[in-house]
Amino acid sequence: MTRNSLLNPEAENADPDQALRPRSLDEFIGQQAARENIRVFIEAAKKRQESLDHVLFFGPPGLGKTTLAQIIAREMGVGFRATSGPVIVKSGDLAALLTNLEDGDVLFIDEIHRLQPVVEEVLYPAMEDRALDLMIGEGPSARSVRIDLPHFTLVGATTRQGLLSTPLRDRFGIPVRLQFYSIEELRQVITRAARLLGMEIAPEGAEEIAKRSRGTPRIAGRLLRRVRDFADVAGSKIVDRFIADEALNRLEVDKLGLDLMDRRYLMMIADIYKGGPVGLDTLAAGLSEPRDTVEEVIEPYLIQLGLVARTARGRQLNGLAWRHLGLTDPREAEGKHSEIKNQPGLL
């Protein structure tokens, strides 16, 4: 079973949200602590007439890492170059990127945890010394050449900070964790997006979409566009709670923002493994999904909601998950039975 594409927090190849992206820190909604810290670092760098220190954004997908990287370049008044870890296969690929940067430019590397080790080795002196060490030739005649680079800011983004090597992670002077959004923050994101899309949305309609957006602005934007489709076909000039609820139910997105894959994940633990604990590899095999998909896409929001707990022995359902599924936790039933047995005269 494939995940509902509406609830996939990964970016689409042709990103329809591009026109909705905020273009400044003032327009950016949410991530208040991170946003205000970035504002301070930018102002300080501009006062000293220096390039901003290297920045690492980490956290679940869809929370604004790419957008913030673009905003940094815009606020600093410099150029912006973007690439991703899997694209940079050889050290020469990275060297070509670095040598084409202008002074002060921002180089954004998405999925930076997927850089090849040989590429990382080239990146270390570039980040620390603004220099590129290259080997020219082969064999006994090979020699090392150092090329000076312009001042630049590397902005890395990752959903798996733990997979970054320690030497690379330590070279980022500004590590920034991005958190899931609150319902109120998502309501503001949706209201702003609706205005830019030229559609009218009632506060309660925006809130209904926000509640089912998994704490992720990217998902909120997708759901908003699909709800707009239902509203247009129904002839409704305004998206209210009824229209939003009807559309999202038909899209099989429930009140907590869970889709069929999420519910299948929870039901597998509840039904087959009696609430757990159960190992990640076992779950991935049962769902016919890669381990990384389960760990990076399905689980973070379920854990954030308190539906699932990661324990040393595996994944385990919490009480909220049983209630959401409309089932009784067998461990609670066993506990009550034990209490009755221990009371004289009752059994």
From Swiss-Prot:
SMART domains, per the entry: AAA
Region (Large ATPase domain (RuvB-L)): 1-181
Binding residue positions for Mg(2+): 66
Top-rank taxon, per record: Bacteria
Gene Ontology CC entries for this record: cytoplasm; Holliday junction resolvase complex
Family matches, as Pfam families: AAA_lid_4 (PF17864), RuvB_C (PF05491), RuvB_N (PF05496)
Reactions mediated catalytically: ATP + H2O = ADP + phosphate + H(+)
Top EC class, one word: hydrolase
HAMAP family named among the record's database cross-references: DNA_HJ_migration_RuvB (MF_00016)
Domain writeup: Has 3 domains, the large (RuvB-L) and small ATPase (RuvB-S) domains and the C-terminal head (RuvB-H) domain. The head domain binds DNA, while the ATPase domains jointly bind ATP, ADP or are empty depending on the state of the subunit in the translocation cycle. During a single DNA translocation step the structure of each domain remains the same, but their relative positions change.
Name this polypeptide is given: Holliday junction branch migration complex subunit RuvB
Record lineage: Bacteria, Pseudomonadati, Pseudomonadota, Alphaproteobacteria, Sphingomonadales
Gene this chain is encoded by: ruvB
